[in-house]
Amino acid sequence: MTPPAVVRVSRRVRRARILVAPRRPVEVVVPPGTSDAAVERLLRRHGEWIARRTAELESRPALGLDAPGTAWLDGQPVAPPAGDRERWYRRQARERLTASVERESARLGLDGWRRIRIGDPRSRWGSCSARGTLSFSWRLVVAPAWVADYVVVHELCHLRHMNHSPSFWAMLRAAYPRHAEAQAWLRTHGPELLALNP
């Protein structure tokens, strides 16, 4: 049996992707020109994985990000802003993540970054380019500050090691002792952050 799903066409993906989030319909993101038959085959092929993943996510404690009349900052509910909520989240993310980058780069002596970009990538929380551009998901501002700080430190460490070599991980462990705890938080609650529709 094919699981029910919402199909979204995006020019930003090269191949179809399945997104499973708690208390949300399964979403299939496909490049333009993908046929209904191809989507059907994809869902059939991954049906068992979708069922397992859905059950796993539903069993996890929810943050309640989708509670009506609520916005979130630093892992805590706050009074919702008036107007465009995503724009508000992006503004908060730029302000808070920039402050985190400035603070952590000074603490670690990593000053090779050039600029900060705030976006909404679906497959990573942050990235670091060879030219020193640090990119972050605005959704990090919803997570506790220590989790967002972990992502900032992770990307700053890439200024020294543009890979995930043993040297990179050794540097990250020394720079951010709570790295494993932050990674676990993102594994548990990341799908709920990605499902947030402000």
Where are these regions (language model features)?
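Active-site-proximal or metal-binding-adjacent scaffold patches in catalytic folds
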Residues: 1-150, 159-198
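Walker B catalytic acidic pair
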Residues: 155
